[in-house]
């Protein structure tokens, strides 16, 4: 005869394994759902914080741009004014040298009474003491490197015997691009 076998520990072991299996089958999906939900919430809150930080940085950048914009515009305007003054000075220096060259062309007994600049034409009027000085002036004006003799105006002798002359000249170098 065989001794009696106690199946109680085996049954308890099987029952415990059975309960563990079904507990795992019911709890695992629940834990998985809770874990996924938690991860999604953490990811969402992290994205929300990142968006908030980016929005704040963008707003701060916009505020700083609004603050610095007038100063930058003022600096740009000052640079443009400085550049305009520099071009004007260069224009004046160019004219100064051209007018000094024109003055050097005048014979000893000739002087200018009026100089005017209108629409690209320099009009000079003056007096000479003799007709030879007037002819020398016209010859030197024709050979001038700065101006081109356009038109000779009226030439007449006044009551004191001086010769009045009038010439219209144009610059050989264009001034249009300077201003």
From Swiss-Prot:
Instruction: Please identify the protein, giving its name as recorded.
Output: DNA utilization protein HofN
For the keyword Transmembrane, the answer is yes
The cellular component terms of Gene Ontology attached to this UniProt record, alphabetical and capped at eight, are:
plasma membrane
Q: Which GO terms describe its biological process?
A: carbon utilization; DNA catabolic process
The UniProt keyword set, sorted, is: Cell inner membrane, Cell membrane, Membrane, Transmembrane, Transmembrane helix
Q: Any stretches that span the bilayer, and where are they?
A: 19-39
Knockout or disruption consequences = Mutants are unable to use DNA as a sole carbon and energy source and show decreased competitive fitness when cocultured with wild-type cells.
PANTHER family this protein is in?
Answer: DNA UTILIZATION PROTEIN HOFN (PTHR40278:SF1)
Q: What is its subcellular localisation?
A: Cell inner membrane
Name the InterPro entries for this protein. Answer: Extracell_DNA_Util/SecSys_Comp, PilN
- Write out the function statement from the record: Required for the use of extracellular DNA as a nutrient.
Q: How does it sit in the membrane?
A: Single-pass membrane protein
Transmembrane helix as a keyword?
yes
- Per the UniProt record, the source organism is Escherichia coli (strain K12)
| Source taxon at top rank | Bacteria
């Amino acid at each position: 005869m065989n001794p009696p076998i106690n199946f109680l520990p085996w049954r308890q072991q099987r029952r415990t394994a059975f309960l563990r299996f079904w507990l795992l089958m019911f709890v695992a999906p629940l834990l998985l759902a809770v874990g996924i939900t938690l991860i999604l919430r953490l990811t969402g809150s992290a994205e929300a914080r990142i968006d908030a930080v980016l929005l704040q940085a963008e707003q701060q950048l916009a505020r700083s741009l609004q603050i610095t914009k007038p100063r930058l515009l003022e600096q740009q305007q000052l640079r443009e004014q400085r550049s305009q003054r520099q071009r004007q000075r260069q224009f004046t220096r160019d004219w100064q040298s051209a007018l000094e060259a024109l003055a050097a062309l005048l014979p000893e007994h000739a002087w200018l009474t009026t100089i005017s600049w209108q629409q690209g034409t320099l009009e000079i009027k003056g007096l000479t003491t003799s007709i030879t000085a007037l002819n020398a002036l016209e010859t030197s004006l024709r050979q001038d490197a700065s101006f081109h003799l356009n038109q000779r105006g009226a030439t007449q002798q006044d009551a004191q015997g001086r010769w009045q002359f009038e010439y219209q000249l144009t610059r050989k170098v264009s001034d249009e691009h300077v201003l």
